[in-house]
Amino acid sequence: MRIASYNIRKAVGLDWRRNPLRIIRVLEALDADVVALQEADKRLGARPAVLPEKALFEHTGLRVLNVTNGPSSGWHGNALLVREGWRVGATERLSLPGIEPRGALMADLEGPMGTMTLVGTHLGLRRGCRQLQLAHLLEELSVRSPRAVIAGDFNEWSPRIGVDILHHDFDVVSPGRSFHASRPVAPLDRFAVGRGLTMVGAGVFEDGEARRASDHLPIWMDIESQP
């Protein structure tokens, strides 16, 4: 199973043009089963989604999990995309603590690899806030199956510190430097893999239009069920 995470910066590329189809082409090349998006909606008014759902499905086979009743496809900019073949159970929108508004989306999935919980999030700019937010996510996940993956923009520049709170229950996967897309210097985007799942491959996707579609590069991870 391939999971991807991608901060798409509202589909505004390094040429400062909003080009949703360019993002969709990158997602098509990623060929992931599920995707956590960050900055997936516009920030004004009703915050409409930036990716047209019809074109998204036609190019990638991915559908947006409907977690709102309005034109936005997500929550605090987060959106989850799921390929056909995965059944979606309970979904939940989480507000995260901190100085700035942050959130996460949580979904129970059932498919070819069994059941699991996926969390997509975009953590805050201050390390203290990020640690509070991770603690909140761990509390929410504590009543669910340990087969869980957290995916998103962790906003953590250090490859060594800042996510220590996860290490007891999760393996943190940092595929590589994903920001800034023009010259990657920081591993801001990461995964955390819970018990019962094993990472068998991961990377930063730099092919095709990924270098100019957003200020972040997408990351991917392949996982398997543990026997």
Provide a role label for each language-model segment:
Residues 1-34, 42, 59, 63-227:
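Active-site regions of metal-assisted phosphoester/phosphodiester hydrolases
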